[in-house]
């Protein structure tokens, strides 16, 4: 095996984030651990835990390069990948690597990536080694790397931010409760810089939150720790976004850590919203960048209304003969007409031949011959029944009364 990269962490810096990781481990448990190698040019490699947030959200629990003690790259810059990823939950579901890595009992932790000599230039396996503070225990976790995934932190690098809105804990809690009530449907978010309000709409439900405008631009606002959490924002343009309600609720819950951070909503011109954890001054200097990207999500209400609209299947009015000119004459068939109602069987006299017919008896007439056969039979049946009733009249039964 050939070693491609080696990474050693500052375990004390990771242990400081144990409370933050425990707050988000429910979502991060089924995700991946990713090492961003593109960020080497921006200060060093970054370790991040990446997972999904609801229907259309992406969580990035990223550790700053300050938590990396040593980094060695045994490949050339052309051969090294942009990022390497592996599962957070080990096979067998017996060990969560992230929980062990951010634990307070770890004294040394390192990652080693390697590949087979006959393989390509990309690393194929990773080995996580941890030594505990009892000077005796030591653990090794080896697994295969996942297919290439782009770094989560670089998805918004080329996006233009047009506004930021900070939510105080009470406001974020009310918005989170409202978003949970909407289920997994779509939420239309409107940011109005003229009225200093943010409107959230889902079907007939609507929630309006106001904020205090700041005198700086979006890129200059909230650059440092938050000293006082209050509803404020720096917005330079009007924007309308559509996000998933469950993803919005999960993002607000993740970025609102008690006594550590408050959520900050970042609006981009492309319609994407990123909920970022703004660290409080009381939390100290934590090497953490926690964010949830909310992608565009078409609301179920709009999809349902589109699907429920009946299609206009009525034929269009066309000039006479238009349909006959579009296909050959022998293929045109008249429009089907409803079948005629059942008719009473009648007897008709045959057509008279040219030769003289025999004389008709005197007791029959043309009127009798043309009369329907069913009518004649019905009359005969009625007359015979009447004669039977006259011959045998119905006898009246007398009931016996013992009191007489």
Curated annotation (Swiss-Prot):
Compositional bias annotation for Pro residues: 335-344
Listed GO CC annotations: host cell nucleus; viral tegument
Keywords, ordered alphabetically: Activator, Disulfide bond, DNA-binding, Early protein, G1/S host cell cycle checkpoint dysregulation by virus, Host nucleus, Host-virus interaction, Modulation of host cell cycle by virus, Phosphoprotein, Transcription, Transcription regulation, Virion, Virion tegument
Chief location: virion
Region described as Transcriptional activation: 301-404
Chain intervals for the UniProt region annotation (Disordered): 302-404
Compartment(s) of residence: Virion tegument; Host nucleus
GO terms under biological process: symbiont-mediated perturbation of host cell cycle G1/S transition checkpoint
Description of post-translational modifications: Phosphorylated by the viral BGLF4 kinase.
Region (Homodimerization) location: 1-300
A GO term for molecular function: DNA binding
Keyword Magnesium: no
Modified residue annotations for Phosphothreonine: 344, 355
Family to which this protein belongs: Belongs to the herpesviridae DNA polymerase accessory subunit family.
Domains as described in the record: The N-terminus is important for dimerization, DNA binding, and DNA polymerase processivity. The C-terminus mediates transcriptional activation.
Subunit structure: Homodimer. Two dimers can adopt a tetrameric ring-like structure. Forms a complex with the DNA-binding protein BALF2, the DNA polymerase subunit BALF5, and the alkaline exonuclease BGLF5. Interacts (via N-terminus) with BZLF1 (via bZIP domain); this interaction may inhibit BZLF1-induced transcription of the BMRF1 promoter. Interacts (via C-terminus) with host NuRD complex; this interaction is important for transcriptional activation of EBV promoters and inhibition of the ubiquitination step of DDR signaling.
Function: Acts as a DNA polymerase processivity factor; a transcriptional activator for several EBV promoters and inhibits the host DNA damage response (DDR) to double-stranded DNA breaks. Plays an essential role in the viral lytic DNA replication by acting as a polymerase accessory subunit. Stimulates the viral DNA polymerase activity and appears to function with it as a holoenzyme. Increases the processivity of the viral polymerase, probably by acting as a sliding clamp that prevents dissociation of the polymerase from the active template.
Stated name of the protein: DNA polymerase processivity factor BMRF1
């Amino acid at each position: 095996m050939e070693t491609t990269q080696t990474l050693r962490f500052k375990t004390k810096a990771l242990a400081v984030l144990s409370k933050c990781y425990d707050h988000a481990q429910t979502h991060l448990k089924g995700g991946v651990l990713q090492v961003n190698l593109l960020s080497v040019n921006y200060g060093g490699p970054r370790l991040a835990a990446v997972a999904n947030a609801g229907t259309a959200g992406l969580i990035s629990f990223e550790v700053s390069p300050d938590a990396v003690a040593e980094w060695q790259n045994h490949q050339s810059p052309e051969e090294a990948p942009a990022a390497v990823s592996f599962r957070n939950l080990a096979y067998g579901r017996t060990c969560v690597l992230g929980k062990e890595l951010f634990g307070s009992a770890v004294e040394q932790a390192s990652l080693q990536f390697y590949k087979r000599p006959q393989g390509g230039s990309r690393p194929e396996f990773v080995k996580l080694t941890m030594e505990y503070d009892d000077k005796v225990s030591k653990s090794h976790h080896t697994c295969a790397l996942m297919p290439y995934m782009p770094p989560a932190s670089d998805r918004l690098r080329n996006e233009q931010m047009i506004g930021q809105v900070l939510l105080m804990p009470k406001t974020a809690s009310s918005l989170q409760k409202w978003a949970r009530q909407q289920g997994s449907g779509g939420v239309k978010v409107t940011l109005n810089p003229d009225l200093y309000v943010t409107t959230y709409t889902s079907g007939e439900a609507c929630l309006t939150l106001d904020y205090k405008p700041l005198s700086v631009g979006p890129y200059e606002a909230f650059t440092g720790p938050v000293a006082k959490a209050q509803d404020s924002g720096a917005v330079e343009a009007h924007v309308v976004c559509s996000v998933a309600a469950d993803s919005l609720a999960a993002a607000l819950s993740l970025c609102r850590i008690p006594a550590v951070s408050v959520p900050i909503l970042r609006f981009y011109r492309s319609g994407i919203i990123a909920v970022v954890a703004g660290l409080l001054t009381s939390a100290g200097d934590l090497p953490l960048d926690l964010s949830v990207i909310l992608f565009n999500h078409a609301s179920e209400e709009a999809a349902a209304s589109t699907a429920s609209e009946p299609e206009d299947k009525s034929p269009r009015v066309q000039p006479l003969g238009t349909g006959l000119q579009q296909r050959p004459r022998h293929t045109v068939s008249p429009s089907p007409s409803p079948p005629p109602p059942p008719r009473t069987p009648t007897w008709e006299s045959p057509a008279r031949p040219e030769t003289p017919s025999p004389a008709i008896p005197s007791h029959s007439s043309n009127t009798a011959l043309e009369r329907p056969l069913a009518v004649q039979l019905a009359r005969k049946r009625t007359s015979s029944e009447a004669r039977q009733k006259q011959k045998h009249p119905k006898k009246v039964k007398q009931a016996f009364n013992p009191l007489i």
